[in-house]
Curated annotation (Swiss-Prot):
Gene Ontology MF terms: exodeoxyribonuclease VII activity
InterPro entries tied to this protein: Exonuc_VII_S (IPR003761), Exonuc_VII_ssu_sf (IPR037004)
Uppermost EC category: hydrolase
Subunit: Heterooligomer composed of large and small subunits.
Organism of provenance: Neisseria meningitidis serogroup B (strain ATCC BAA-335 / MC58)
Protein name stated in the entry: Exodeoxyribonuclease 7 small subunit
Record-listed E.C. numbers: 3.1.11.6
Record's keyword annotation contains NADP: no
Keyword annotations: Cytoplasm, Exonuclease, Hydrolase, Nuclease
Main location: cytoplasm
Catalytic reaction equation(s): Exonucleolytic cleavage in either 5'- to 3'- or 3'- to 5'-direction to yield nucleoside 5'-phosphates
Amino acid sequence: MKKNAPKSFEEALSRLESLTQSMQGEMPLEDALAAYQEGNELVRYCQTKLAQVEQKLQVLDTDGLKELNLESDE
C-alpha cells in the first residue's frame, strides 16, 4: 500500500466497507476510479494478511505439526 497504509486487517476491512458504500451512491467518475484503486490495494493487503495467518495456523497431529486445512468439511 502506498499512502495511509492500514495498521491492521480490521482497519483495512473497515475502510474497504466504507469505500464500497460510497461507490454504491452517486460519485464523480474520477472519484470512483480513485476509490476503486484504493479498494483494490486494500483487497490485496487483506488477502496477504489472511494468507500469512493461514500459514501460521497449524494443528498438532499424531505425526507432529501439520498445516490446518480451513477448506476441509471435517
